[in-house]
């Protein structure tokens, strides 16, 4: 994996092949009522595994993984309690790439309280390139 590959020209190939794409969901994203483990506990477990493997970061792109890690639920996919988002966990930080306007007040507080920053999905490309340049 080369950081330079991410730093090249940005394109939006879906715009070319799916010009009539429907708008992204604005349905609310809510906090789970009774999760088995807290967000902080899950982040600690992931960071422990990262340290064991010598990893600088973990990028979660599977919607169910993002939902599980954050204890959040949505309704972007029929019959699945997931939402469109990505999660980048580094040793000292974490970023949730999601439209923050969709988070309920309770969900926003829980995410911030766990030390996860909410970041616009439009910045994902740059964030991954920066992480790669840092060796993450």
What are these regions, as identified by a protein language model?
Residues 1-136:
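Terminal domain-start leader segments
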């Amino acid at each position: 994996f080369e950081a330079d590959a991410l730093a090249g020209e940005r394109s939006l190939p879906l715009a070319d092949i799916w010009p009539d794409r429907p708008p992204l969901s604005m349905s609310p994203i809510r906090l789970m009522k009774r999760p088995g483990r807290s967000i902080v506990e899950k982040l600690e477990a992931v960071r422990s595994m990262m340290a064991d493997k010598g990893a600088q970061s973990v990028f979660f792109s599977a919607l169910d993984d993002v939902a599980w890690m954050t204890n959040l639920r949505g309704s972007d996919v029929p019959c699945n309690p997931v939402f469109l988002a990505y999660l980048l966990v580094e040793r000292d930080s974490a970023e949730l790439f999601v439209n923050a306007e969709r988070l309920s007040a309770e969900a926003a507080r829980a995410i911030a309280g766990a030390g996860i920053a909410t970041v616009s999905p439009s910045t994902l490309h740059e964030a991954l390139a920066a992480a790669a340049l840092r060796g993450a």
